[in-house]
Amino acid sequence: MSDKKALSLSDLDATKASAEAFEFEYLIDGEPSGIFFSVLGGQSEVVTREVAELINAKRRRDVARAVRAKSGKPADFDPIEEDIEFGQRLAAVRLVGWRGISDPFTPENALKLCQTNRDIAAKITEESDNIANFMKL
């Protein structure tokens, strides 16, 4: 039998743990860059709320499109650029700070960074989705 103490539901609250920023250094070819990002966890309320808002907006467009199609109006579609922007916005909302970048951190600059550097955006999302970065059991 293990000597580990039992965990409470509070100990397993990933939403609460994900609300505390996690800082990581961005590596370039495995080497330190001196650039550090602070991210919220993917299960945080802030990230979850933004994801819901983005998905709900897409669903509203889909419903409006279906209604137009039934009325005989020309159908349109969501271009791939909207899907790319969706992913960039999902990465940017997770980012709450940085060190080693001369520009000030703002939500607008976070989005700009995620729009102009896919590798950084992907790393932000990866670290944010890694629950081990936030849960300390």
Task: Briefly describe each language-model feature range.
Residues 33, 44-45, 75, 100-103:
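Polar low-complexity intrinsically disordered regions enriched in Ser/Thr and small residues
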Residues 97-137:
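C-terminal charged interaction modules
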Residues 13-16, 94, 102-105:
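Solvent-exposed, flexible loop/coil residues
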Residues 1-63, 134-137:
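Short, charged/polar N-terminal "headpieces" of proteins
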Residues 51-96:
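Negatively charged, Asp/Glu-rich surface segments that serve as flexible interaction/assembly modules
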Residues 12, 47-55, 86-87, 91, ...:
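Generic structural signal of hydrophobic/aromatic residues within well-ordered alpha-helices
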